[in-house]
Structure formats: structure tokens, C-alpha cells
Amino acid sequence: MKIFTKKWFRSRLNSAIKSAGRRYTPQANVTLPINRLFNWLARTEEFYKELFNLGESFQKEWEESSLKKNYAELNIPSRIMNKLENEMAILIKFVATCQQPTFNAIDFNYPLKIIKKADKKIVWLHKFLREKERKLIEGADKEKQAYPTPKDKVNNFLKDVIDIREILNELRSTCGSNYAKITNDRSVLLLGEAGIGKTHLLCDFTEKQIKNNIPAIIVLGQQLQTIDDPLQSIVTELRLTLSSKAFLRRLNAIAKVRNQRILIVVDAINEGDRKGWRQGFQKFLSTLKKYPGIAIALSCRTPFDKVTVPVRSKIVKTYHRGFASHELDALKIYTAIYKLPLPEIPILSPEFSNPLFLKLFCESLEGATIKKKHAQIHAISSGQKGMTNILEDIVIKKGEKIAKSFGFVPKFVWQLIKDDFASSIADKGNGWILLSEAQQILNKHIKNSVKANKFLKALISESLLAEDIVYEHSSKTPKEVVRFTYQKFSDHIIARHLLIKKFDKNDPKSSFTLLDKLGWLFKDEHAIYNNAGLIEAIMIEFPNRINNKGEMFDFLPVKVNGQLAEMFINGLYWRDSKSFNEFTSGWVSGILKQGNYRNQILDILVALATKPKHPFNAARLDNYLKKFKMSDRDLHWSEYLRYQDETSAALKIVDWIERFSGDISEEYALNYVSILKWFLTSTRRMLRDRSTRALYYLGKWYPSLLFNETLSSLEINDRYVSERMFASAYGVVMALHFEGKNDFNKKILEPFARKIFLGIFSKTAKYGTTHILMRDYARYIIEIALLHNNSFLKDADKVLLQPPYKNGGIRSWGEVKESEEDKKNHKSGSAPMHMDFENYTVGRLVDHRNNYDYKNQEYQKVLANIFWRIYKLGYSHEIFKDIDSQISEYNWNSKEQVKTDRYGKKYCWIAFYEVAGHRQDNGKLPERYGQRIPDTDIDPSFPNPPKSEEIVKVNFLNNSDLPIADWIKTGPIPDMKPYLKLNKLSSHKGSWIMIDGYVSQDNLINNRSMFA
């Protein structure tokens, strides 16, 4: 075969994939952020596209800003603006230059210096404009001002300043990233634990390059067992009769002709000649540096990088985190591949971030009947089966396959692991045994030493055991050892062994005291720290050992410190549901009262709450949260929600429902609705909005569940909850009544509407309110029900349904003015009501008031009503001031489009809507609003954003052989006529007339683009 052809590159990839075996599963592709790294390393089209988009956004943000165009209107010093404009022009030119395909290094340090200078001016401008804003407010004329007012102009400039700072930060982040270093160094070392997906990632990227007709080479480290010169060993493995220098010259020449870097990948260098790699590593990299058309990606399993890569090597290291933050995508893909039912809850154990673990989990169920698969998944989802049982199942199933292939009885491997290996590792007390000791264990059972050796290799290759290296004491020479592949399983199986051998259930206290029993684990803080995983595993197993008559904490000779509390919390998710008892509840309650670990344990409780049959299910969480005063709940629960990110149980639950609401059964939906309801207390707008929409999704499938929970939310002392529950219910009613199903309209909607009327609008209503949004949602639900049966309410009751209302909610409003002393005590950002809300939002409730007219008596009364109400709700500046200052500061520095509200603002919004309803009832709202004020918070119809249809499939840039000048001159001009009128669009019949659309195509490698 001719070398360095597309066919040759493909054959080398196929050979590597075959050798990789089960480590590469092409159909199990999960899109991960780390893919971006390889685009930068190889300078693919995606790399140039990313820089193009960044440059376009940067230039647009600056060129279209009021700050650039009209800075003189606010007397901003021209010396500041001239310097800033010059710096921005330099940065725009820099990004434009980066978009030109090149092999050369890009000087990312230069723009970082310019950004630093520009940022100082942006910070100065922000202070300058804030001061101008303050002076305008103090000197505001109560007479009507033309729009835009001076204050409006300042606000527009401030918004521009914030937006420009964000785009500067984005450019700074890009230029200062490891990716920038990698694209210039043309080399990267990918590190990660066993099974994390390094081989899959590298094979997949190489596959993508070759599919795109870009040369790339991958070699597996296991093929390089004897290395004198790493580069020459690679050439030899590729079966080439070339010197390493000739090999690199040929590849570099191809890269130059194509104007495209060629990537050489060596996967798992730890599986080859580690000493050879270590000795030849620096020479290998320095040789490659001479060939600008070539980039290199190496991977190594941790901790073997310590003995394979020189300590002083300056190669950029990056860590593969597996499916972290993408577990839900992975779970959906893998369950489909292995034909398993999708669990009805997100499995929140971090072990599922490991691709190999997820694969082994799926394989352990693969051979079961459909009925058994469903039963197993249901047992895990419902809480009947703990995570430790899952680990055992994986090991048992995998062990049976290995045993069968060697002619042993099915349980041979399981007995070997839980008895022999667990015993030896437990006796060692450090989580491992020497490789030679592992061989001795097998030699006892397998008399043929060759067969015993093969059997050990099988246990390692099938991931039941893992090879590792350790350094003992001051020794500089590592020892080869064997440990269990998964730390959780290792801890669990050793803990079980210790509890059998060293624990006396008739005298638990002495078992934890005596050093020759289990006391050595607790003899001091150092011992506790070093054995954290093992202690956690013993905690998980302990209740079952004493017939659920206590927790390990009840028998310990030492005080329960933070370390032990954290182990207890971490173990809760892993436990069998039957091991939860009254003592568990007591310790959970105790930890919840301590602030240090509250967020951590609440996240575990949220995860457990998804499991219907678990003792700590959603009903229990519901009962717990109902008992709080609103302000206490905000400090305790809403603060937990504020700190949660995409890896938390809370966000994963929302994500799960957004993706899979149609696959969730009624039993689980009931739990989800209850949990989501409590997410609505949050001041994080993103979480609150997504949770409301998730409730709507579930409600469309199970309207009765949502409606019942909506009615029960009226009992909750936080209107943030019931307002959004009614919003989601109203959305469901709008969606389902339109379908015209009598079962829904008669059997579900009508009874719901009747209960709403009795609870909110009747003369004896217990939950009447002036909250204008919630009241409107409730009224519109009833009015839709009346469309289908106008007689289910009496005429007299229909009158009570229409505004203005005489009853319900607060009818006698107090007034409290914020004292001057309180105002002085406000830290930056800590006031409950900031200027925009105070002037614009509250001002909208008062007719004939001009902006900044703070002396308007009716306006002053409304403000006093709102302050009176927020204090009645439990707001206190003293308890929320530090948190609200922190939120204000975070919002200023955050890139998030949807911000987090301060708690003061939350209480102000509730009071605002209640005052608005009261003023509506008394005819005091501005007439221009009609029956609906502009501050409607969320669209209760929950529309899906319109999809962009891609109708042009023709590649107008396919003639890449012509020089650019000829291509521009000779065309051809793209023909758009066929797309102006279509007989069919997607699956929808036409005719369809094009009103608006565009065609944008780029080929950045060949420096061509078109837009029509």
C-alpha cells in the first residue's frame, strides 16, 4: 500500500481501533468540552471558526456601543476614550489576524497586556458613570422629562460598559488559557484514571480528522514495548522503512501543502516501555518542535505519569474528567446501546461519570430478560437497591464471564475477590497488595503458574483489578501493586471483611476502641483522614450488622468531628434504603442544624427525595421544608439552591425532566413535582424559571398531580412558590384544553377550577389574595373551565370571579418608611430596594407620576406599603445584608445573562404584586395597563423558541481549486430562487413563502466564505 495516502491513514486508524478493543465504542459518543482542546491543538476548522465568532462578537459589541459613538454626551474625558478606542482597535486587529490559517505561534501575551490596560479604563468608566447616576438622582427634577432622560442615557452607557467588560474577559480567558499554550506548543499530555475514556477520545478525534480528509496518525502505547528512541519506535510500529527524520519531513511537507496541521497521537504511553519513554521524552518533544506542521497528543494513565514522564517536562498537562457534568447524556446513549430501560431518575452517583464504570454497569444487565432489566433499573431508581449492591452485581457478572472462559465455576472470581483479595488488602491496611502477592494468591487456587498469570491479566484487563505503583517511605523506586479498580468497591468489600472478622455486634463500643479490632481506624485525626473511604464504607454497612439499632456514631469512642460528619453524608446515597432508621434521622437532623455541612447534606437529601420508596423521599422533604418561617427557609434552603451548579442533584433533576419528562411514570412524577415546587423559593432566576417550566412539562403528562400540588402550595408561607405553581398549572390548562379531550376538561379541569374558586374567590375563601399575578392565573384557569361547562359555577359566583375584588388578601395596608439610619447602614448592594426598582418598577403603580419624582405623595404611600409588607413577610436587613451584598457583587462580575436576585428584592417583588392587586381593586392602577400590568414575570404559555430550518443543502464553496481572485470573478453566483417558495418544509406541506432567512457558509481553511 502506498504510504501517506488517505487509505494508508485509514488503515493505521483501523489497526489501532482493533487493538483498542472494548476501550473504543464508536456509537457511544458523548460530546464533551475537552473535544475543544484537540481543535486548538490541530488547528482545525472549528478552531478558526471559534476565533472568527469571538472576533465578530468583540467587534460588534464595541462598534455598536453608545460608549464609542456618543461618549461626549456625558462629558466622558476624550483622553480616556481615545486611549480605550486605540486599545480596542489593537485587540480587534489581533483577533482578525488569528483567523488566518497559519502554522506559526500566536502571541497571546500581547493582547493580555492590552486587555489589562483597557480593563482599567472600563473600571474607571463604571465608577464615573455611577457617580453621574447618583448626582442625577439627587438632583432629579420632578417635572416630566423627555425620553430618554439623562438617567436613561447613563443607564445605557453603564450597560455598554458591563457588556464590553464581559467580552474583554472572554478574550482574556481565551488568550490566557491552557488551550492558547497548547496551540502554540503543538503538544499535550492527556492524563486520567483508568477507564475515564482517554482511548475513546483520541480514537474518536483521529476518526473525525480522517473522515474530514485531514491526515492523522494514532499508535497505541501497548505496541511500543522496547524503546530506544520513542520517535523511531513509532515509525517502526507503523511498519515504515524510513528514518524518524524522513518520516517527519514527509509529514511536514504534506501539512504545508494542505495548510493543515497533522496530528500524531500516542495513546496510553504507560502501557509501553515506561523507562524508554522517560529517557527519550525531552528529545522526542524537541525534535517535533522543528516541524511546525506536526502536533502531538500523548495520553497516560495516572499515577503512571510519575514513572513515564520526566518531572521537569514542560509539556502542558490536561485531565480527562470523563462524563462529569454530562452524565445524563451518557446515560441516555449507553442505555440505548445496551437496550436497557432509561432510569426514571438521574443516577447521581459520581461513579457514573466514569465511562468504563457506566459500560460495566450496562454490561452487567445486558444478558438479562427484558422483565429483569426493568426490575433491576426500577429497584435502583426507587431506592430499594443501594449503590453498593450495584457494585457487587457488576463484579459478580463480570467475574462469571472470566471464570467461564477459564473453565472455573461461576462464583470462583467472586469468592476469590471477597475472601482472598479483600482479606489480604485489609491485612495490609493501605488499599493494595504487591503484584507478587497477587500472583501468590492465585497460585494457591491455580496450580498451573502460566494459567494463573493469564488469569491475573484477565482480572486486570476486565477492570476487576487494577495495576498501580506506589512509593513506600523514602524509597525513590516505585513498587508495582494491585488494587481493586473502583475505590468505592474496594472500601466496601474490605469494610465487609473487617466487620465479619473484627466487629463484635454484642459489644460495638469495644470493637471501635480496641486497636486490634477497629480502633486503629479512629486512634487519631490522622488515622481518620487516611482511612476516610474505609470508615465511610463501614458506616454504610454498620446498621445492617446490628439489626438497624443505631448508627456507628452512637458507639464511637471519639467525638464526631467535621471529617466524620462528611463521611456520613457521603455514604447516605450509597446505602440500602432498609438501613435508614430513627438514629439515622437523628444524626441527619443534627448535621442540618450545623451550618458547615448543610448544603452538602441537603444535596444528598434532594437526591434521595427522587426515590419514591426511600424513607427520605419527597414527602419527607416536603414536610421538613413546610415547617420553616419564610426568612428562615430562605437562609437555610434557598441559600443551598443559590450555590448549586450543573453537577448538583438539584440542577440534574431539572435537566432530567427537561429531557425525559415523557418517559417518567406517575409514581416518580409525583416525587418530582413535590421537589420542584420547593425549587421555586430560589432567587436564582434561571433555576426558578427552569423549575417552573419543568413543572409544566410534567403537568402536561400528569395534570392531576400538578393541580393537586398547586392547591397544596397555597398552604406554603412563600408566595414565590404558589405564584409559579399557578403559572405552570395555567400553562398546562391552556395546552390541554385546546386538545379538546372531554376526560381532561370534565374530569380534571372542572374539579380543579371549582377548588380554586372555593379557595381563592368565594366569600369564605381561605386563600384569597391581592397578589395580582397569582390571582390572574387562578382566574384564567376557571374561565377556561367555564368555556367547556358554563354552568359549573352559579351566576352569583361568576360575579365574584371578576375584578375588582372586595375580599381576599390584605385589605388594610400599613405603612413603614425606611429610616435614614437604616439607609446609612446599607452596605453596597445590600438595600432591599435598589434605585431602578424603587423609581421605575414601583413608580409604574402610580398614575400621573414622573420618573424620579420621589415627593409624589401617592408614590410615597405605595413605597411605605411595600416596606411594611416585606417586614411582615420576615425580611430583615440585619439578617440578609451580607448575603445581598455578596449577590450584588457577584452579579456585577458575572457573565450570566440571567442574574440572581437579592433576597431583599424577592420580598419586594412579593409585596409589589400584592400592592398592585390591592390598587387594581381600588381603581388606582394607571388606566393604560388595562387588566394586566407589564411586570408579568414569566410567560405562562411556555412557548418553545421557533426552530431555524436549514433548507439549503448545496455547498456553494465546493470549488476550492480556483485561486480566490478567479473564484470571486467567475462565480458561480449562488441560485436562491428554488428556496423562495417551497411545497414542503420539514414534514409540513406548503406552499411556504420565504419571508426572512439567510445562507452563511465558511471554509476557513481555504479562506472562503459567502453570505446571502
Enumerate the language-model features and the residues they cover:
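P-loop NTPase signaling cores
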Residues: 118-424, 440-454
